[in-house]
């Protein structure tokens, strides 16, 4: 009897935490991402060199005790630029996916709740966007809007929206005829309250998992656009822009560190986001 009472008194959030604590790799990935975020935020407090401190006596210096990952072709400290670059790369990833998630969630829940012609229009529009490879769609959008970080965020948000709409719609349809939604309808709750107070919370799990994974993909997409000259422009320390400015040294012996470390930052971010997303999925939806 006591065990039954104890199990009933545990909240869903507590159950989630218990399951998530078993996901050691996800916790490690989340810790690495947290360290990267904190380093990016507090960069001015622990970095001794400025973002664009030129030192022509230290041009293309290899990693050393003074310059941990070396210097670039202008004598700037690469570690400093990588940390400041995390501000841009992580911000682009987070903001673009946030905007896509907000818009997609609203469209998805409206499609599920209203149904009919509105559902058809929203889902067919999503199908049109799904017909194009996401990266090519991002290139097309940036080509129309012009280069720059803001337009990259807009482009990534646009092609992130359909998937969030699909996830939200699917989750919302699963609870649309549940007892608590029917009770809210019977009590005269407004459509807005039913959609965003009673239905939306049940979709958060799927949204959160995809959101986490999508941030990593968005960082990679933004870096790719910058590498092609369509995103952040030099002297921006965005990781893709750093790769672009050092592309002539990719195959040059002794200077591979110029592209190695920005590439590792991108790889580590994408990997950690995917591992964290897998851990969240396992904790939210145990099989």
Segments from the language model and where they lie:
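Amphipathic cytosolic juxtamembrane alpha-helices at the membrane-cytosol interface
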Residues: 76-91, 95, 115-123, 176-177, ...
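Generic hydrophobic transmembrane alpha-helix motif, especially the helices
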Residues: 68, 72, 78, 102-104, ...
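Hydrophobic alpha-helical interface/terminus motif in multipass membrane transporters
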Residues: 110-111, 141, 168, 181, ...
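Alpha-helical transmembrane segments of multi-pass integral membrane proteins
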Residues: 92-96, 111, 126-127, 155, ...
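Non-cytoplasmic
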Residues: 136-140, 144, 148-157, 207-242
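Alpha-helical transmembrane segments
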Residues: 161, 165, 218, 269-273
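Gly/Trp-centered helix-boundary motif
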Residues: 1-105, 109, 117, 135, ...
